[in-house]
Amino acid sequence: LRDLGFKINFHYMPGLPLTDRERDIAGMKQLFDNPDYRPDMIKYYPCMVAPGTTLYLQWKQGKFEPINTEEAAERLVPIKEYTPEYCRIQRIQRDVPTKYWSAGVGLTNFRQLIHEKYKPKCRL
């Protein structure tokens, strides 16, 4: 696709069921280490739980524990550090008000929190 002039944009969601911090970071590193991937742009969406979804039912049944704001930040900081400069980070969280989510990151300005709290570790 790149040979035809297309830009490649990936979406990456840390915190999905059956993952943990190490697995999320290793998976993201593979996106840039493997020459079959290497996106030009990326959007990071920490897993959020919305009412009426299977994930919501799993959470209510105690079968899934979503990551909270701090856990999401702890996963995204090393991921951001590893993201090459050529790759544009387009988004760090969905622009959906937190009142529509049942669990997960509790801030609408999550990217700002990462920049302020972890600024020495993140490229802006």
Regions found by a protein language model. Name each.
Residues R94-R123:
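Terminal amphipathic helices with adjacent charged low-complexity linkers/tails
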Residues Y56-P66:
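Glycine-rich tight-turn/loop motif centered on a GG-T
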Residues L1-L55, T69-T98:
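Conserved C-terminal portion of the radical SAM core fold
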